Amino acid sequence: MRSAMLFAAVLALSLAWTFGAVCEEPQGQGGRLSKDSDLYQLPPSLLRRLYDSRPVSLEGLLKVLSKASVGPKETSLPQKRDMHDFFVGLMGKRNSQPDTPTDVVEENTPSFGILK
C-alpha cells in the first residue's frame, strides 16, 4: 500500500513538472536564483529521454493502482507456501500424515501401583 502511494506521489510530481507547473521564487533574491539554477541543470541526454517518453493516461494510472492494491491479497498464499518450503528445508521434511498411536502392551509398561 505504501509503495502504491509513493508511486502515485512521484508520478504526480513528474507529471506536474512535465506540464510546466513550476514554483517561482520572488525576484528579490535574483543573485541567489542564478547560482541555484546552475546546480539543477540536467544533461541533454536525460532531458531528451524524459521528453521523448510516452505520456501516461489517467486510465492507465488507475488500472496500475487498482492492480497494485489487489495484488498483495492474491500473492499472500504463494508467499506462505514459499515460507513453508523454506522452513521445511531448514528443519527437514515432516510427515504429511499425523502420528498414528501404536497399541501399548501393558506388560512392557512400568506400573506405579494401583491408585485408589
Swiss-Prot record:
A Pfam family reported for this protein in Swiss-Prot or TrEMBL: Neurokinin_B
Renumbered to this chain, region (Disordered) spans 93-116
Q: Does the keyword Signal apply?
A: yes
Which positions does the propeptide occupy?
Answer: 21-79, 95-116
Q: Which UniProt keywords apply?
A: Amidation, Cleavage on pair of basic residues, Neuropeptide, Secreted, Signal
Decide whether keyword Signal is in the record.
yes
Name where it's found: Secreted
Give the similarity note: Belongs to the tachykinin family.
Q: What is this protein called?
A: Tachykinin-3
Q: Which organism is this protein's natural source?
A: Mus musculus
Source lineage: Eukaryota, Metazoa, Chordata, Craniata, Vertebrata
